[in-house]
């Protein structure tokens, strides 16, 4: 931390069925600064991006995330793609992207600069190689075990 200035890190995601990959991601993101704010994807955004509604509504996903020690605050995103206005309001120093998020770091950084924000955009590595750390794989295993 430079002087008394706190470094604010922002991440975003669905976080529908929380798993160990999410925890590793949040821990790594928190290590990039002093304060971690999570933007939880709006239910409509999940439906549009994943082709299915979320298992858990955004309010529940946010509540679960608030209980994680690495997370300082949680906000629910707006419907649609990344809201530059929301990011501007949150005033991050760093935006950490997950390894499976399909955003280009450079493009996002340029969009942020176009609205007057100088934000470092970092892609975090995928540390957990098992299928247990993918929500889609967890859903598949649940249906195989309980629906066959």
Curated annotation (Swiss-Prot):
Reactions catalysed according to its record: FMN + ATP + H(+) = FAD + diphosphate
EC number annotated for this UniProt entry: 2.7.7.2
Pathway: Cofactor biosynthesis; FAD biosynthesis; FAD from FMN: step 1/1
GO biological process: FAD biosynthetic process; FMN metabolic process
Obligatory cofactor(s): a divalent metal cation
Keywords of this entry: ATP-binding, FAD, Flavoprotein, FMN, Nucleotide-binding, Nucleotidyltransferase, Transferase
Gene Ontology MF: a single term: FMN adenylyltransferase activity
Binding site for ATP: 14-15, 19-22, 100
Assigned protein family: Belongs to the archaeal FAD synthase family.
Protein role: Catalyzes the transfer of the AMP portion of ATP to flavin mononucleotide (FMN) to produce flavin adenine dinucleotide (FAD) coenzyme.
NCBIfam families given in the database record: cyt_tran_rel
PANTHER family: FAD SYNTHASE
Oligomer and partners: Homodimer.
Name of the featured protein: FAD synthase
Organism expressing this protein natively: Pyrococcus abyssi (strain GE5 / Orsay)
């Amino acid at each position: 931390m430079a002087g008394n200035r706190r470094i604010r890190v922002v991440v975003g995601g669905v976080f529908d069925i929380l798993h160990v990959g999410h925890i590793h991601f949040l821990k790594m993101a928190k290590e990039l600064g002093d304060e971690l704010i999570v933007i939880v994807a709006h239910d409509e955004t999940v439906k549009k991006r994943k082709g299915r509604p979320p298992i858990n509504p955004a309010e529940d996903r946010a509540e679960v995330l608030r209980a994680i020690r690495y997370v300082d605050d949680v906000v629910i995103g707006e419907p649609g793609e990344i809201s530059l206005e929301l990011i501007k309001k949150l005033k991050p120093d760093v935006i950490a992207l997950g390894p499976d998020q399909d955003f280009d770091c450079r493009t996002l950084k340029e969009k942020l600069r176009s609205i007057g924000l100088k934000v470092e955009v970092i892609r975090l590595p995928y540390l957990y190689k098992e299928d247990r750390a993918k929500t889609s794989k967890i859903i598949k295993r649940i249906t195989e075990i309980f629906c066959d």
